[in-house]
Amino acid sequence: MNDIQKSDFSSKSDNCGISKTGAEHDGFGWDLHCHSSFSDGTCSPAELVEKAAQIGLSGVAITDHDTTAGWQQAAAAAQKLNFPLIRGTEITSHFGRVSVHILAWLYDPQNEAICALFDNLTKMRKERILLMTDKISKDYPIDREAVFACMKSGDETTPGRPHIADALVAAGVCENRSQAFAGIISPKSPYYVPASSPDAVQVIKAVKNACGAVGIAHSGAICSRGPVLSEEQIEELADAGLDALEIFHRDNPEEQRIRLKKIAGRLNLLATAGSDWHGKGKINRMGENASDSETVREIVKRSFLTVAGM
């Protein structure tokens, strides 16, 4: 995965908002949190990179859930456009009763512990989605095949609730993903199956063992994602090797950003920014929150993989 392979990707105009011609990027920041069709995004990795270049980002990170499957396509597109790419993953975990999504950047993807971790997470994800789909299918016109059909990258797609949501939309049950998440597949729904995940300390140590940098995604999303980590819990994760907190994210209210800035300052953690872009899968706009080059250089310094121009 270290070597970028050439691709025959050709740009096109589609629902990812990409035009047929390229655009010079003037470098207004780095979006360190974006998803492709290899998890729950709607655009291919190549389209993700091309859009980042066209809107003027300095660079972009591909951070699909629990997989590196989209890295090669993204890297090929980045090389073709001479555009800086950060290869990463958003890893599902928990710490106590808090759901913790860990942004892992620029680690060795061939590390045995990382590979085993992703294999286990994929297995747990598939089991959960099948259980939820079977429960929903008793009352609504969707089945496993309909959900699988919504996984745009086939067997390499990391399965998740968004794919059930897409199947419900395709069946005319829901108008969009947001409606599905607010109702049929919400945690309060009788069809909901809780996610299984590894402990956050275990995940952080695995990424650090693979020589990557580690951040906590949407670390102050108290309104939309349930309980958030306390200062004491963040300190424990910092002791395990945590490098950063994603402070600038649309789900973090201002009071949480203020709290997290103070914690990051005390613990000497990096403050990162990301859009959590999913193409048409969310309203989030790529680049709406962007990290500066100094922060990215520090991430690269701590990591196994390199980034062009850094």
Task: List each model region and its residues.
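C-terminal active-site subregion of NodB/CE4 polysaccharide deacetylases
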Residues: 268-272, 279-304
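Extended substrate/RNA-proximal surfaces in nucleic-acid metabolism proteins
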Residues: 14, 21, 77-235, 290, ...
